[in-house]
Amino acid sequence: LQPINTLPVQPSLGERRPAYLTAADSLTPAFNEYAELFVNDGLGLYGSGIVGENGTMGDELIVNGLYGTFAFSLGQYYEQTDGFRENDDIEQRIYDVFAQYSPSPAFSLQAEYRFNEAETGDIGARIDHAVYSPTYRQETERETVRVGARYSPASVWDVLVSGIYQDYTEDAIDESPVENPFPGAAVEGAGSTEAYIGEGQVIAQFGWLDAIAGAGYLNSERNDSAVFDFGPFGPFPGPIVSVDEDREEHLNAYAYTHIDLPGAIQLTTGLSGNRHDAEIRDLNRLNPKAGLTWQPAAGTTIRAAAFRTTSRILLSDLTLEPTHVAGFQQFYDDPVGSEAVRYGIGIDQRVGHCLMAGAEISRRDREIPAEQSAPDGSSTVNIFEVESTTGRAYAYCTPLRRLALTTEYAYRQDEPQQENTPIATQLETHRVELGASLFLPVGLTPRIRTTYIDQDGEFFDMMAGGFTGRGDEFWVVDAALGYHLPRRIGTFSIELRNVFDEEFNYQEYDPLNSVVSEGRMLLAKFTAAF
């Protein structure tokens, strides 16, 4: 839906980047902060860089331009770090080419090509940071081609079409697997996935009624091979070779409406149908959606939603289907073929011009398929149930013209309904974040953020042969000092993560987007636009 413009396409924003370059990253501005208020023909150059301890460095460079009805963006992104321990390194390169052509206000075409290659060690997130493989290595390569079009035959109608093709390969080897009890064991594997997805959507806006309807089709073929060598003390005299081929097809259709009712109420209704054919699970499901947004007074918004979803492959985490219902997220990184029911309620409150606060709580019940192997070599697919409760409360305040304060509390509890489930761990986490930013007239911006985490859970202990309870409670402080260059050229900042070098045991929910740094780390960053 975006009109033709001069905003650069950042290669890094299309990827789930490694944690070392994103944790505590609230100071770094996005490139669109330097965009002009009015669109003019011409070229733009945007760049950013980072350098720090543990061999950390990276850069992002983008050239973009606008000439009448044609716009383009060329970008590259590079990052590397040695991490906080042995074999915790990451090296990644991303290249992006984007073009958009709009011969008239009613019609627009766009195309994008992305290439990503990465090499990593054992960067898996475990509650015990001392448990890792010193020999695990992984190399990945992904090519993505995306095309899209928008046609608006009338002011109340929009028609969208999108197509994505992706080719993904990975190779991994581990000469000392963490989860293998046999000395001298080794594992080597390779995999490739070729997939494409096509989607179409129609959007209609009739004053008090907005309607969205669409459909999509995905086809994916994956080939995997693995060699298991249990070593001289293993149960088998030689290596075991495993070859697997899997094909997935997914067809979905959906319709959503947003209806404005009297009393400042907006009602959201929806229905999606999903047909999923795969080796692990076949599904045919209808998923109802319902949401309500009510503004009983100026500055007050009350939200509620209930809906069911079916997890499917999303190439590059992209889809035309609406991802939220009344502000509640629908799609997560669940295993393909999972089903979930989520319901929740929330409130957002604005007080004057200096305070924004709110809270929400929701429940999400999941059914997750998992393939399990039997001693005779056969395998079966079992369905495991997990109940998750999440809560959030926040307050953003600007008590003074140059002072901004933030407070946020987050809660999450995952409760598997079966014992010794292989797909989820009993886990309860409380997280509190307190932050302050001061904007001085000379261009300096000191910032500080304090994060408190209290986590308890049941984790599998290989030496004990079962699950044991573990937890930790700790504080982490991050600080930064930024400087805004004259004439809005850019910013420069120095950032110190985990100021007091706090040691802790914490299980990340998303290992590639860590909320806290494992150790003290000093970084310098810059962003510039010309």
Q: How would you label these PLM feature ranges?
A:
Residues 8-95, 106-107:
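Outer-membrane beta-barrel translocator/receptor signature
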Residues 49-53, 67-69, 78-82, 115-119, ...:
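Transmembrane beta-strands of outer-membrane beta-barrel pores
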Residues 69-73, 105-111, 119, 155-159, ...:
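Repeated loop/turn-to-beta-strand initiation elements of outer-membrane beta-barrel proteins
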Residues 86, 94, 108-195, 232, ...:
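Flexible loop and strand-edge segments within Gram-negative outer membrane beta-barrel domains
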Residues 87, 100-102, 425-530:
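Conserved C-terminal beta-signal and adjacent last beta-strands/turns
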Residues 119, 125-128, 228, 233, ...:
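Surface-exposed extracellular loop regions of Gram-negative outer-membrane beta-barrel proteins
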Residues 203-218, 242-356, 361-362, 397-400, ...:
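Structural signature of Gram-negative outer-membrane beta-barrels, strongest in the C-terminal barrel
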Residues 260-266, 357-370, 381-461:
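Gram-negative outer-membrane beta-barrel transporters
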